[in-house]
């Protein structure tokens, strides 16, 4: 596939995962309303904050990629690293647990969807980084 078209596919994946994170944040708001203890409320507040920030960050990165296309590798690197960090946080949450939240015991379909999308985002972003470097080398140099 042509790298220019892959940038659009990557942006579509990024916008999709941002919507997934907003849905998960909305679910956490519902859990916060039904929380009984202060620890449960604190955990829900942390989840809402994390998922809202991640969703907004993905929206910003998707917009940056659409605006700059293949002229800079920076948003591709940020998206790949950020997605890897989110997968790492999820792995910690299901194995050893997060201090306030504890170990994640429920099998959440949104978490599975998010991790599949993030794997695709990492693969596409890493694949597109060399294309950005080649395109920027072909650009004319400005003599000042």
Show which residues each predicted segment covers.
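Membrane-interface extramembranous regions
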Residues: 1-144
